[in-house]
């Protein structure tokens, strides 16, 4: 990973397999929702949304390695985007991820609003709409996006890698900036 690298987000298919304890506590124990409750924002029942299969990115990641210079992958699981991405960022570098580059699926907003869950807690527990990150050489970003589009993966550039000194000596390895797009 080098300063200037592009951070590419690949959309999640929903909650994936993380955060169900929080979701259960908020939506069932707290808000009293039933699995068969129709949620207009979902266009289906809560149960159908929660049973959405987790997207598996292995073949997509392998395809990326054949078409562009990939420096790292980060699977966004428990711990959220910032904590998982931080695991691949070397000392001396920093990743900035701009929330304004995507809109989380309605299920994430429902968990937040129904349970008055703060954004920081949601981001530490849920993927917030990003299931996988690829860190690629900047000159390969367009090719990476084209490869993912050809494979039917919704993907976008969500950030970049900089020298940690540019972000402040005591900056975290990853900073989430801005507000989510609506």
Swiss-Prot record:
Its main location: cytoplasm. This is Putative phosphoribosylformylglycinamidine cyclo-ligase. GO terms for cellular component: cytosol. It comes from the Bacteria. One of its GO terms (molecular function) is phosphoribosylformylglycinamidine cyclo-ligase activity. Pathway: Purine metabolism; IMP biosynthesis via de novo pathway; 5-amino-1-(5-phospho-D-ribosyl)imidazole from N(2)-formyl-N(1)-(5-phospho-D-ribosyl)glycinamide: step 2/2. One of its GO terms (biological process) is 'de novo' IMP biosynthetic process. It is found in: Cytoplasm.
